[in-house]
Amino acid sequence: MDEEVVGQIGQGLMVLVGITHDDTEDDAAYLADKVVNLRIFDDSEGKMNLSLVDIGGEILSVSQFTLYGDTKKGRRPNYMNAAKPDKALGLYEKWNDLLREKGIKVETGTFGAMMDVQLTNSGPVTLIMDSK
């Protein structure tokens, strides 16, 4: 992105969002609710017991079609399982809107652009979530 910062957050989550052909707004709603309420932040005793809502956290939402890369055959990933850009963009925007409706500050990258994304991963804690 030409060294321009287009999305940045403080404490919270970076969510890499992959969208496939049969994903729906119901899937986006389910995952938005799950992400903001999942108790994965430490409480005063160091136990994972607080949600993004509890800590007043933010989300950096990054569209990532490569999550649906299939590497079973050959030496180059096949991205046929990723939704086409027009569908993916609409559902990605809906996902971000649903998070904002829940009172979460959401920053995004630029959809479809090549970006350098930086992450400080405490723990590290990395989770894979799916609605199906």
Swiss-Prot record:
GO cellular component, one term: cytoplasm
Superkingdom of this protein's organism: Bacteria
Family: Belongs to the DTD family.
Pfam families: Tyr_Deacylase
Coiled coil: none
PANTHER family documented for this protein: D-AMINOACYL-TRNA DEACYLASE 1, D-TYROSYL-TRNA TYR DEACYLASE
The protein, known as: Inactive D-aminoacyl-tRNA deacylase
Residues spanning the signal sequence: none
